[in-house]
């Protein structure tokens, strides 16, 4: 099957630096049609993407991975987005319940290595299970989050599941996102107002103090060695070969070889 490399996307990523999130979302729908889905953990940035998809009437499906140990506020946010924004949100689940996993493997999230295994089983694998239905996933990473995400591109090949990851909010600053949320009264997970800078499983997520890094509340019990869950390609160590396989017509549309798909 034809291959798409990260190097193939260099020129397009430079062009996309000048595009708005709305333009990038519209491009995503035109290029990938029903083979693109947004992924959201029901955090603030994900809600912004969901609001844009709804406002633009793009009909893009949203995938939410319910690890089985999510905060109730997160599940309530998902339900509100479905109800009030009219979104098609599909909830994905791990193969095992947390109870069954613990019985088989022990409490994985108590060690760095175990945390990586736990996140892979409960977050990454459910997404990989459906990845064959899609050519691209829309995320909500922003360079303003810092860390490894400081340099996240708009388009990135995801070798984990052979899809293109699209980050339409990559250039959006904290102030710009706050302004968008206020202006459009975006539905936001209420945990953010309780001091949670980032939100995931209730076992491994805590609020942060004003002077702490945004991700200090994730796996706090493991210190600075655990920061990311691994579901986003920008958070993983880039392999020697950043290449994925896609149908040739899809690659042609991505790279603008058909005039209708150039923006």
Model-derived segments and their meaning:
Residues 1-263:
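Nucleotide-activated chemistry modules centered on ATP-dependent adenylation/adenylyltransferase
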């Amino acid at each position: 099957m034809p291959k798409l490399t990260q190097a193939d996307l260099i020129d397009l990523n430079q062009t996309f630096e000048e595009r708005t999130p709305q333009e990038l979302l519209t491009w995503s729908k035109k290029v990938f049609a029903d083979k693109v889905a947004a992924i959201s953990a029901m955090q603030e940035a994900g809600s912004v993407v969901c609001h844009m998809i709804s406002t633009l009437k793009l009909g893009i499906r949203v995938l939410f991975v319910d690890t089985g140990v999510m905060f109730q506020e997160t599940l309530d946010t998902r339900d509100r987005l479905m109800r009030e924004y009219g979104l098609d949100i599909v909830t994905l689940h791990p193969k095992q319940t947390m109870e069954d996993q613990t019985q088989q493997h022990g409490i994985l999230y108590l060690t760095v290595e175990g945390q990586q295994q736990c996140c892979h089983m409960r977050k990454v694998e459910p997404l990989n299970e459906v990845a064959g239905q899609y050519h691209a996933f829309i995320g909500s990473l922003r360079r303003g989050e810092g860390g490894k995400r400081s340099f996240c591109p708009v388009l990135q090949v995801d070798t984990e599941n052979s899809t293109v990851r699209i980050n339409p909010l990559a250039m959006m600053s904290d102030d710009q996102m706050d302004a968008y949320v206020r202006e459009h009264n975006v539905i936001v997970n209420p945990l953010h107002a309780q001091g949670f800078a980032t939100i995931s499983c209730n076992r491994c997520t805590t609020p942060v103090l004003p002077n702490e890094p945004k991700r200090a509340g994730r796996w706090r019990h493991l210190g600075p060695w655990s920061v990311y869950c691994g579901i986003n390609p920008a958070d993983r160590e880039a392999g020697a070969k950043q290449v994925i396989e896609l149908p040739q017509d899809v690659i042609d549309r991505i790279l603008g070889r058909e005039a209708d798909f150039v923006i």
